[in-house]
């Protein structure tokens, strides 16, 4: 009888131990599953947020490009500066201008430029002429006010019939602010990178136009 009691007790202890172990395993599995689901949920939320902001930026760029393309109608006006000023104000450009194939140019406001200024030698002119359609330049720091800008440009004519290029500059402040507002979680933040791997918008402004590889150095 004593032996049976001892054996029964051992079995009960073993059973209890197995139950506790099973509960611990189940608890761990549930924890890992919940954590994985939370991580998936955060990833999906982050992707949705990034997509939404990307669509906003794309729409912003599309609207600017459309306005510049429409300005071509005034390209051969006797006094295009008035039309350019209206375009600048309506499209919220910092400046709008025409560069002609004969190297003449007209801006939406009075500009003091070097006597040898040649619009056909400018990157925006060359990029639009080569593309044969509307383009947007890579972001760059404006020499006049040290602000981050991009240029939207559209060629007038093509090839041997190229008459010139219509263009407008836009400050990137609104885009940078939009990206800075991205924060799916308190520990995360958004940043914008160009197609050539340069940082356009980041919470650390010192990284502006730096290679994305610089982030790994921090």
Model-flagged regions — what are they?
Residues 107-182, 186-189:
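Extracytoplasmic/periplasmic ligand-binding sensor regions of membrane-associated signaling proteins
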Residues 30, 38-41, 45, 49:
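Long amphipathic alpha-helical coiled-coil rod/stalk domains
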Residues 44-137, 182:
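Extracytoplasmic/periplasmic sensory segments of membrane signal-transduction proteins
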Residues 100, 157-158, 194:
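Short, acidic, Ser/Thr-enriched surface-loop or helix-capping motifs
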Residues 104-105, 162, 198-199:
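Hydrophobic "anchor" residues
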Residues 78-92, 127, 165, 169-210, ...:
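Solvent-exposed, extracytoplasmic
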């Amino acid at each position: 009888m004593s032996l049976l009691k001892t054996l029964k007790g051992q079995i009960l202890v073993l059973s209890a131990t197995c139950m506790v172990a099973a509960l611990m395993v189940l608890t761990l599995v549930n924890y890992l599953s919940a954590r994985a689901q939370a991580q998936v949920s955060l990833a999906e939320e982050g992707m949705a947020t990034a997509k939404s902001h990307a669509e906003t930026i794309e729409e912003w760029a599309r609207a600017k490009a459309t306005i510049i393309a429409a300005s071509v109608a005034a390209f051969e006006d006797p006094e295009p500066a008035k039309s350019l000023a209206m375009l600048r104000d309506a499209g919220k450009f910092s400046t709008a201008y025409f560069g002609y194939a004969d190297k003449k140019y007209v801006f939406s406001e009075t500009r003091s430029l070097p006597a040898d200024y040649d619009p056909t030698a400018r990157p925006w002119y060359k990029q639009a002429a080569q593309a044969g359609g509307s383009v947007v330049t890579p972001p760059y720091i404006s020499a006049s006010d040290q602000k981050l800008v991009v240029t939207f440009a559209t060629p007038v004519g093509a090839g041997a019939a190229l008459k010139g290029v219509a263009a407008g500059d836009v400050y990137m402040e609104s885009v940078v602010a939009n990206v800075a507002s991205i924060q799916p979680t308190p520990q995360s933040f958004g940043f914008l990178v160009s197609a050539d791997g340069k940082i356009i918008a980041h919470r650390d402004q010192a990284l502006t136009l730096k290679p994305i590889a610089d982030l790994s150095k921090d």
